[in-house]
């Protein structure tokens, strides 16, 4: 009960003293009620306080007047800011209170502050205009840009705004600017996307390492935040090569077809993209096969281009572009830790690359080899040097992070007498005839190693050593050589000589002193030596790159186009909407230009001919005939691949495995003439199976089994054909590029004598049909009558898949192939033989097959290929034992005694790589 009066007394205010001034009471009311609740302007309070700076107000706040009521004073401190409803009012009140304490002598008016802020904003916008530019696809770290702004404010003696305010100022200048969060997990940072630093800006070199001597220059900036994971090639998946020089901008010498050049450059870019994709996937051994298939499988009509000096130089430029992208992909410029297995694979790849290129260029013009090999050697040397440096950096990094090791190295290096070593170095060059004043002296050597000691004392990282070496080489080699016009190579040799000698003498002293850190210092010295060699080689390679650039400028009509082609950076397939109409993901080669096909019913009252682009089908089955559009058509044929067989060239040795037709001389076999014979196919290469749902083009058609779709999707695109073992005649007219003309017969696989053909009772003009099965081959055109014989061609007879390399008339060559392209990201693997998948028990082995007397059980031995019959006969059903003339299937396995021996090993000879010339022959032939 005694505590109650105490509590009451605690809240009882003391008797106000008559000495308290009215101004002090007003100030108390201001803090209690808030300035918004006063009935008089608040300036009156501050004017009174300004008139009496040492009066009661200032004393009350300092607690110098004991007469001030204690209760009111407590409430003043407890209610500070609680009664203010607006943040701006509170900030204004606090600022005015502080200004009053400073006697308001240096306080700026609000108007003056607004003027200064507006002026600073204008200066900032002008600074942004001078140093930055809109650049699509470029990311700039937000922290770097703000650091540049702080440097600008320091130089201009301005008060910098906060990061948020500066961000608003940037968007005033670049309204379309966006932000992205980039970086590894745990170390990601915000970046401005769509803005870049101008080359004329002072900040350009510091960010983009323009003054850096190697790819690793500026890695201190790139490595900000460190790395927690090892480098993986999978992070580069989707990398696309930049654009190669366009044939439209080239200045040709002599009579050269622009279409052929364009085709060749397109072929070579796809070839280079395949090399890049396999390098990213780690399939380095597959790259050798791509090289062989491209160069040894070059079409004959493009071979003369390889002797043209302009084309050879363009190849060199393209090689330089490929090698730069390969280097960026294989070796990270951020000096990220790499797995040992990846380093070993890259070393092995660099070791074998030159030999792979040389072997692939056999039997080709020597001028091409002489120009390509020097570029190859520079690439290999650079790859080896960068791999070695990166490996040493990974080993040296833990040593530099170990404080005990660093202290030991500093202690041991302090015992080395650098002056005595400098004197020895001076003696070694005393007999030199070089009298230039800027020669690298012993003083420079001592200075350099003194800087090295300072870096060790500061616990410098690998990136700091790189930055220091860049400065050393720049100041003592490159800059001096430019000033006096001395050869860079000569200057670099002198520097390396003295650097190596001085380093060897330092290691000699450490050995004599029994330094405990000898191993660690030896590792650091190896790292520094390797980087200096890399910096020198990079400078020499840059000079060679400039020569290629000048060469390209000479051949290009537009110099800007040549510079853009040579300096373009690789992109990513994830940045572009590629393959919008792509088919199944397993497709390796996709048709991209399918012809929209019209279908007309065929009736008995329609005896006329059909246009070449129309496909007849029975009128009675129109309700069940599915009409497919472009997408369905591509899906139905998407599983077919281009046969991976290079043409058999008469002038070349068998450098590569060219499949079953390798080694067939083109001179063997008669020159085909109309009417041409239909080829019979080895039974082991083209096995067939019964099929209940047989269509116009059966899914198990006679093409190589390794390229047959697995599993076989049923195709319902075309109606049934009524003729068993017969095929319709194809027209003699010249067809478009997507059509093939030819006469074929559904002859049995075993040999049978030709039989006479009686005229058909129904006459009808022939029509042509679209050739959809691009995976099939050995189809020959015919300009003769609509009849063909069932004779068997010898195994050595030429096949008509590849153009002019086979000796038959131009009229028998196939038309242009359907436009195709190889998938950019695809790993090519060897496909198992057909029997390993569908016949693991060898049930269908040739020796165990039952010999049949005839391939067509329901037809006579004389099977004719004649003109189509009328619609009434087209609607008849097809027995299960029928065959659709080269496209269809059969449930019987014929005896083929003449080709058993040849077909036994043909499956093993099939190569798994699609030849580049088969993909582009259509475009090349069309451009001739």
Swiss-Prot record:
Subcellular location: Nucleus
Keyword entries, A-Z: Developmental protein, Differentiation, DNA-binding, Nucleus, Transcription, Transcription regulation
Region Disordered, residue ranges: 1-22, 53-102
Keyword DNA-binding assigned: yes
GO biological process, one term: positive regulation of insulin secretion involved in cellular response to glucose stimulus
Function recorded in the entry: Transcription factor required to direct islet cell differentiation during endocrine pancreas development. Specifically required for the differentiation of 4 of the 5 islet cell types and for the production of insulin. Not required for pancreatic PP (polypeptide-producing) cells differentiation. Acts downstream of NEUROG3 and regulates the transcription factors involved in beta-cell maturation and function, thereby restricting the expression of the beta-cell differentiation and specification genes, and thus the beta-cell fate choice.
Family from the record: Belongs to the RFX family.
Protein name: DNA-binding protein RFX6
Organism phylogeny: Eukaryota, Metazoa, Chordata, Craniata, Vertebrata
